[in-house]
């Protein structure tokens, strides 16, 4: 699933070419449209002024105050293509025809993602937790979030209502960087461990953005290029390989229904 760094990378790709005028919004599969606050025709002739991100959502702001909000689900791609390209790959469900002979395509084979046409985003995003790369996300905030929680720290990091944008890959990587086992009870972390985890989260996300995200199979950026952070992963997807710190074989276990990768020696 595309996580914060992957969506941030696509956002950055789009920001490079905006603003662009919408010529037509083409919905090729109705069930991919999760919410429609306004008619499609209201977008015709309007200008996409800005791309932004909230958690794992990508937001396109239109000059008449409307918003197009995308979530890429498990396998979604959002990329720019020249208008002259007439052959479409399978599972392209949304096409935004733009000026400058361009079009923006949303492709999603598994259809866990979608598009929301919204007049306001404040209510839509009101339940999302803090952005981990923001100044507001600090050790004090993380300490408040962890206080009294008996769940595994890995599960807490994946809770989008508490921290927005972190998924399985970056939770494992941040916990390894902080030296914390993914199955540790959240409330058991010391102040020093919380500080280390906060730094680890910010560092691993920033590094992944630098390398344009992680590609194992589906993910491509807004230019249809794979990310490169998979070449820099320390633990995720490296079961039974040597720990980069101590050399012991890395472990894998199921926590909250998801695979977690860690070092039994380096993480306590």
From Swiss-Prot:
Highest taxon listed in the record's lineage: Bacteria
InterPro entries with a match to the protein in the record: DNA_glyclase/AP_lyase_DNA-bd (IPR015886), DNA_glyclase_Znf_dom_DNA_BS (IPR015887), Formamido-pyr_DNA_Glyclase (IPR020629), FPG_cat (IPR012319), MutM-like_N-ter (IPR035937), Ribosomal_uS13-like_H2TH (IPR010979), Znf_DNA_glyclase/AP_lyase (IPR000214), Znf_FPG/IleRS (IPR010663)
Phosphoprotein among keywords: no
Catalytic activity: Hydrolysis of DNA containing ring-opened 7-methylguanine residues, releasing 2,6-diamino-4-hydroxy-5-(N-methyl)formamidopyrimidine; 2'-deoxyribonucleotide-(2'-deoxyribose 5'-phosphate)-2'-deoxyribonucleotide-DNA = a 3'-end 2'-deoxyribonucleotide-(2,3-dehydro-2,3-deoxyribose 5'-phosphate)-DNA + a 5'-end 5'-phospho-2'-deoxyribonucleoside-DNA + H(+)
GO MF, any single term: damaged DNA binding
Entry's EC annotation: 3.2.2.23, 4.2.99.18
Active site: 2 (schiff-base intermediate with dna), 3 (proton donor), 56 (proton donor), 258 (proton donor)
Keyword Metal-binding: yes
Keywords per UniProt: DNA damage, DNA repair, DNA-binding, Glycosidase, Hydrolase, Lyase, Metal-binding, Multifunctional enzyme, Zinc, Zinc-finger
NCBIfam families: fpg, PRK01103.1
HAMAP family: Fapy_DNA_glycosyl (MF_00103)
The protein's assembly and partners: Monomer.
Cited function: Involved in base excision repair of DNA damaged by oxidation or by mutagenic agents. Acts as a DNA glycosylase that recognizes and removes damaged bases. Has a preference for oxidized purines, such as 7,8-dihydro-8-oxoguanine (8-oxoG). Has AP (apurinic/apyrimidinic) lyase activity and introduces nicks in the DNA strand. Cleaves the DNA backbone by beta-delta elimination to generate a single-strand break at the site of the removed base with both 3'- and 5'-phosphates.
UniProt protein name: Formamidopyrimidine-DNA glycosylase
């Amino acid at each position: 699933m595309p996580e914060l760094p992957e969506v941030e990378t696509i956002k950055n790709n789009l920001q490079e070419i905006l603003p662009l005028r919408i010529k037509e919004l083409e919905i090729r599969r109705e069930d991919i449209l999760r919410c429609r606050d306004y008619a499609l025709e209201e977008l015709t002739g309007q200008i996409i002024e800005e791309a932004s991100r909230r958690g794992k959502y990508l937001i396109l702001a239109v000059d008449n105050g409307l918003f197009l909000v995308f979530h890429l689900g498990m396998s979604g791609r959002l990329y720019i293509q020249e208008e002259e390209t007439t052959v479409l790959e399978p599972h392209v469900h949304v096409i935004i025809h733009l000026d400058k002979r361009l079009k923006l395509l949303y492709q999603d084979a598994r259809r866990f993602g979608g598009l929301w046409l919204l007049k306001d985003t404040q209510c839509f995003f009101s339940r999302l937790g803090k952005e981990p790369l923001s100044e507001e996300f600090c050790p004090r905030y993380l300490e408040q979030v962890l206080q009294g929680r008996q769940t595994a720290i890995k599960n807490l990091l994946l809770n989008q209502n508490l921290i927005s944008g972190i998924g399985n890959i970056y939770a494992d990587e941040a916990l390894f960087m902080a030296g914390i086992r993914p199955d540790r009870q959240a409330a058991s972390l010391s102040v020093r461990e919380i500080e280390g985890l906060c730094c680890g989260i910010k560092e691993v996300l920033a590094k992944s953005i630098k390398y344009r995200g992680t590609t194992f199979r589906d993910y491509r950026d807004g230019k249809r290029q794979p990310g490169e952070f998979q070449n820099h992963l320390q633990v995720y997807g490296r079961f039974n390989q040597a720990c980069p710190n101590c050399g012991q074989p890395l472990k894998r276990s199921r926590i909250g229904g998801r695979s977690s990768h860690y070092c039994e020696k380096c993480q306590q």
